[in-house]
Amino acid sequence: MTDATTNGAIGAGTLTGESLRKFFERDAITVSRDLLGCHLTVDGVGGRITETEAYFPDDEASHSFRGPTKRNGAMYGKPGNVYIYRIYGVYWCLNFVCHPGSAALIRALEPETGIPRMMERRGTDMLTSLCSGPGKLCQALGIDIAINDRLLDRAPYAIAPSAPVPIVSGKRIGITKNAEAPWRFGIQGSRFLSKPFR
């Protein structure tokens, strides 16, 4: 489904301290939309966020649905905290905390900096597939549990907002509960998505 509006991402410069808190201390849908176009780097490797999903504490598809646990503790951190978890026992996934227990999953990114390192880590030189999914993105950026549970203004992370971009929205991917919620968001027309929007 195509969204007729753009997101509200504005400003320039890296988000730190109070600006980081203000950006993320909002509902997960708003944050997920406004993350589109933002520039994310991990140890200098990264690019433009092109696809996100929103999750809430009362959302059966969310890790926080049954409350805090040892595994999801980072999801209850401060706004702008990083929550990393593993799926299928293999792939890492990157999330940013909004309100406690709610988060934005980063699903895809358009590579911009450190591309040779991404290609080496991913074992491919196909630009559009380097970060076209949450697991691929984490592999390309060298993300694992060792850099979980820290704010985005702390090394090795850096994130900067962008001008508004046109967005599309649709159902989230790979879930069976609350699967109809249209809480997946992407940059309209981007070639750097995990899957096309329909």
Curated annotation (Swiss-Prot):
* Taxonomy of the source species: Bacteria, Pseudomonadati, Pseudomonadota, Alphaproteobacteria, Hyphomicrobiales
Question: Origin organism of this chain?
Answer: Rhizobium johnstonii (strain DSM 114642 / LMG 32736 / 3841)
Q: What is this protein called?
A: Putative 3-methyladenine DNA glycosylase
EC number(s) given by UniProt:
3.2.2.-
Give the Pfam families listed for this entry.
Pur_DNA_glyco
Extract the GO molecular function terms from the UniProt entry.
alkylbase DNA N-glycosylase activity; DNA binding
One Gene Ontology term of the biological-process aspect is: base-excision repair
Q: Which family does it belong to?
A: Belongs to the DNA glycosylase MPG family.
Keyword Ribosomal protein, does the record have it? no
What sort of enzyme, by top EC class, is this? hydrolase
Q: Which UniProt keywords apply?
A: DNA damage, DNA repair, Hydrolase
